[in-house]
Amino acid sequence: MLLACGLGVALGGGYELLLHSSFIIGNQELNAGLVELGVGLISGWGGVTEMFA
């Protein structure tokens, strides 16, 4: 079990680390996303497959 706390901005690899955790705690100002997908790239740390798992 892994607990992650996201505060501020979690883009790219930072968001993928959040996706691999069991529980995510964040405030209302948390801005998280995979920016690689917007430019047509595939993320390298398995974040895309973790989103659909």
UniProtKB/Swiss-Prot annotation:
InterPro entries documented for this protein: ClpP/crotonase-like_dom_sf (IPR029045)
Identification of the protein by name: Putative uncharacterized protein RC0837
Lineage: Bacteria, Pseudomonadati, Pseudomonadota, Alphaproteobacteria, Rickettsiales
